[in-house]
Amino acid sequence: VINNNDNNVAELSLGLKDASGSADVLNVELYGADGKTGAQNGIDDIIFTAIETLNITSDVVSVLGNEQLTTTSESNLITDISADTALTTVNVSGNDKITLTVGAEAALLSSLDASGMTYDAVLTTSAASAVTVKLGSGNDTINFGTTLTGADTVTDGGNRTATTADRLTATISGLSTVTGTGNLNIS
């Protein structure tokens, strides 16, 4: 559990006592402070090796019971997830805004699942492998950079308004399956 309370964390090295298995899971819960920017609720780099699944929960420190990271600048922020090729799955859930980047080191990432997010998620992946992305019910953005190929798939999570549709950004060399009835804005 990471309770930022208006403090940016530089590097955070995590691991398991025994990560020798083939189905190791690391759970990270983020609790940002309401009224603070992503930089203030941020982690520059989460570093780990030999873990196949990373589960991230994005929430807010609750004092009054009604806080939420809702403004444009508010967010739980992970600037980089530095994993090795063992990482194949990242699951993101929670009810408060999150911005995260999975670094290119996670070359075998195959699933980036934010379907458990009920608020906005801004996700970036640089994985060269085929990635299946599932977005949540918020106003989500997925960035592939230059790694989007015909083998990647994106499923929208139900945010289907004309002005706040889920967004995909990439330098497109190929676009494969996009499912759902929402709008897909490509820029």
Feature annotation, model-predicted:
Residues 1-187:
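Solvent-exposed, low-complexity segments and loops of surface/extracellular structural proteins
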